[in-house]
Structures are given as C-alpha cells and as structure tokens.
C-alpha cells in the first residue's frame, strides 16, 4: 500500500511497517483545504474530501487514475461550493474538465457548474493522462475520452 502525503518541503519517501509513504511537494499556493487533527500526541493536516478530489483531478497519477476519481466523486457527500472554489484555486483547466465531465456522467450536482465550464481551457485534455492517446474527442468538455 502507498500513502501519499503533501508537504511544502521536500521529504524523502519511506516505508514504515510495510506501508510506503510518498511525499508530494506542493507550492504554497496549492497547499490549502486541510484540517489539523490530533493523531496520538501529534497534530497532522488531513485533506478535506473536496481537496482530495481536486488534487486527484489535478494529478491522477497519485490516485490510481480516473476510475478512482469517479468512485470518489460518486461515493462522497461533498460541498459543491468548496469543490468549485478549490478547483478554481488550482488553476488547472484539465482538472476542472475531468470533474465536470464525471459529475455530469454520474449525476452529481456541482455548485457553480457554469463557472467551472467557463474556466475550461481551449485545448483538449486527456480524461486520464495515465492512458494513451486513443479515444473520442468530446467537444462539450474539451476532453479526449481515452478510457474504454
């Protein structure tokens, strides 16, 4: 099992009790959406559901691809306003396109959907950047649907 942890400083990856911890270095502008929680005698920051989904859409390689993002979006009771805010703050048009497409596909209501659509970048983005270039272009979302 691999656990991904975000930090603003470079930290070497490590394995503890058979669990691999991979540290992702974020710029300060992308380090938001966390709540401080107590774990034993330590305080750690844990990402909100909305931040987790936004980060997954931003970097699908850290969440095992588009299928896991879809599962998370479908199974989660989320705050649509917060998700919209976080997606806008990430400033990643591809991430926004992925979330809007999946939300429409899964009948998940997004707060401020039109604001997100207005933030689509002009080029086509891969639905899943981990996969190849084969697939159908969907102009409504400016996405290459490269998932079978």
Language-model segments: which ranges?
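Short gly/ser-rich loop at a beta-strand->alpha-helix junction or flexible surface loop bordering the NTP-binding
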Residues: 1-35, 140
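Hydrophobic alpha-helical interaction segments
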Residues: 32-148
């Amino acid at each position: 099992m691999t656990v991904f942890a975000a930090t603003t400083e470079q930290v070497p990856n490590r394995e503890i009790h058979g669990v691999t911890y991979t540290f992702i270095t974020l710029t300060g502008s992308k380090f938001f959406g966390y709540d401080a929680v107590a774990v034993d005698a330590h305080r750690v920051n844990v990402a909100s559901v909305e931040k987790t989904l936004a980060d997954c859409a931003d970097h699908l390689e850290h969440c095992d691809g588009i299928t896991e993002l879809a599962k998370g979006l479908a199974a989660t009771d989320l705050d649509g306003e917060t998700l919209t805010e976080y997606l806008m703050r990430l400033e990643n048009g591809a991430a926004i396109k992925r979330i809007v497409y999946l939300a429409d596909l899964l009948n998940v209501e997004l707060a401020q959907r039109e604001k997100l659509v207005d933030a689509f970048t002009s080029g086509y983005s891969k639905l899943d950047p981990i996969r190849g270039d084969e697939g159908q272009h969907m102009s409504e979302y400016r996405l290459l649907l490269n998932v079978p």
